[in-house]
Amino acid sequence: MQLFVRAQELHTFEVTGQETVAQIKAHVASLEGIAPEDQVVLLAGAPLEDEATLGQCGVEALTTLEVAGRMLGGKVHGSLARAGKVRGQTPKVAKQEKKKKKTGRAKRRMQYNRRFVNVVPTFGKKKGPNANS
């Protein structure tokens, strides 16, 4: 039966169905130079085991096998590993309601009381409203 193998290029193999996936990998390695241990053979998106024969895997005539390179995995280094860390750790706190600011006559009354009525006479130079002392 005929079998299509899509690696870097599309290849056509003539097989009997008794070949193992490892034999297909070796054939692709000789054609394209990709080491067999770096290949992943996929049938309809599912990886195939090296020891399994094509008949056991459900490969029929005119089926396309895909050969993908093995991706190196592991930890992410650098700033990508910390992305979103602070926001994820910060607890959500409900916003507090603020008092409405006074306007007009009430605001002027509050300013008058602060400046002239509640004043405690002190000695020395007069300090401004933002002085830290």
Curated annotation (Swiss-Prot):
InterPro entries xrefs: FUBI, Ribosomal_eS30, Ubiquitin-like_dom, Ubiquitin-like_domsf, Ubiquitin_CS, Ubiquitin_dom
Gene Ontology MF terms: protein tag activity; RNA binding; structural constituent of ribosome; ubiquitin protein ligase binding
Keywords: Cytoplasm, Nucleus, Ribonucleoprotein, Ribosomal protein
Pfam family, one: Ribosomal_S30
Chaperone in keyword set: no
A GO biological-process term: modification-dependent protein catabolic process
Cellular component, GO annotation: cytoplasm; cytosol; cytosolic ribosome; cytosolic small ribosomal subunit; extracellular space; nucleoplasm; nucleus; small ribosomal subunit
N6-succinyllysine found at: 125
Modification(s) after translation: FUBI is cleaved from ribosomal protein S30 by the deubiquitinase USP36 before the assembly of ribosomal protein S30 into pre-40S ribosomal particles. FUBI removal from ribosomal protein S30 is a crucial event for the final maturation of pre-40S particles.
Miscellaneous section: FAU encodes a fusion protein consisting of the ubiquitin-like protein FUBI at the N terminus and ribosomal protein S30 at the C terminus.
PANTHER family the UniProt entry points to: 40S RIBOSOMAL PROTEIN S30/UBIQUITIN-LIKE PROTEIN FUBI, RIBOSOMAL PROTEIN S30, ISOFORM A
Name this protein carries in UniProt: Ubiquitin-like FUBI-ribosomal protein eS30 fusion protein
Taxonomic path: Eukaryota, Metazoa, Chordata, Craniata, Vertebrata
Gene expressing this chain: FAU
